[in-house]
Amino acid sequence: GICLGHQLIAKTYGGQIDTSNTESYAKVEINIVNDENLFAGLAPKMEVWSSHKDEVKTIPDDFEILANSNLCDVESFKHTKKDVYGIQFHPEVHHTPKGSTIFENFYEICKKKV
């Protein structure tokens, strides 16, 4: 899920969503803490275009954080047992220079399941 989809995944699985401490719509540098799968080839940092009005405050059980930033503790997460991923930022816009790599990595994850 991207942005709201990321938040809906968290809420559906029992996580907590709330208003961001710093509302912003801007370029942000994220810290990639797990560069397997979704962020393969992108660590340790990446510039992204992010929207922070609401955000995931607490991840659900069986999820792990993949990326964070100085504005948001949960920029990205994944389920530990399923191929369920969420990202707060927007990889689809040109303001996220390496966003297409995230989509390519996600496509590779999906191909392994077919």
List PLM regions with ranges.
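Acyltransferase
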Residues: Q88-V114
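Cysteine-nucleophile active-site neighborhood
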Residues: G1-G41, E47, P97-N105
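Catalytic beta-strand/loop cores that center a nucleophilic Ser/Cys/Thr
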Residues: D35-K82
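Residue-level recognition of conserved beta-strand positions in structured domain cores
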Residues: N21, A67, Q88-F89
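Short aromatic/basic micro-patch
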Residues: S24, S50, Q88
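Active-site glycine-centered loops adjacent to acidic/histidine catalytic or metal-binding residues
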Residues: C3, H52, H90
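Conserved hydrophobic/aromatic beta-strand scaffold that supports enzyme active sites
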Residues: K27-E29, V74-S76, G86
